[in-house]
């Protein structure tokens, strides 16, 4: 069973709901998921949260990371960088149709987009089932490719 660390912003109820829904979908598809928001009590220290997340990335076979927002979440960016340094495949996705990259055509910062093994952006008005299918296809592509673009 492939183990996935699911990275992304988790600071609003909407973000937490999206993350949890994606995690349950991937579990139904046979993946083992580590979703940080489900493992870190609010009273943990910053150091404990950091160490837990790093250990979870070490445990995972790959990282799947949400790049939504005006600029992708800084914690998510670190998690991707750490996974890249460890040689793990990374899938980056963006459901936010605003442009947040280094150039007009880039969806987000080039250090994130170029470190991804596979990535995709979701066009405006994409149906949830289309997003889920695209996610599965991209994860499979990344696993087949291993690390690197």
Predicted regions and their residues:
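Conserved catalytic or regulatory cores that recognize and/or transform ribose-phosphate-containing ligands
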Residues: 1-149
